[in-house]
């Protein structure tokens, strides 16, 4: 089991928590959307991204008890959001695909996590000191970015170029 420590809020042995780094990802996304005037175009029907985020979150918890569908979720992010361009201003307008943006951010989160574990700032139970975290953690960060991103878009909808009238209402 990946969570040997005692916890106050637990479902089937998996702690429910939102740690500093997890909350920071959502805060970072909200902030850079505003700072760099980011637009996401074309954006798929909003409800589909909500379903994807829910599936990712459920897999984070359930993969300890049922088959892990992470590879399917990776593919779903590319299929659903592969055409979505992240358009931002940094002197002039630039853009690249949303999955590439998520991959870049997940790499830097993984790097920060490794720096934290190598310096002893953060440790995992059962891991030796100064242990390098696996690339699987980068995959987890990649998926977490979509959960955080969709959570932010529940509040900040303006940057999304949604072409679907059935999108979840803002109220």
Predicted feature locations:
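Aromatic-rich, lipid-facing transmembrane alpha helices and their immediate juxtamembrane interface loops
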Residues: 1-171
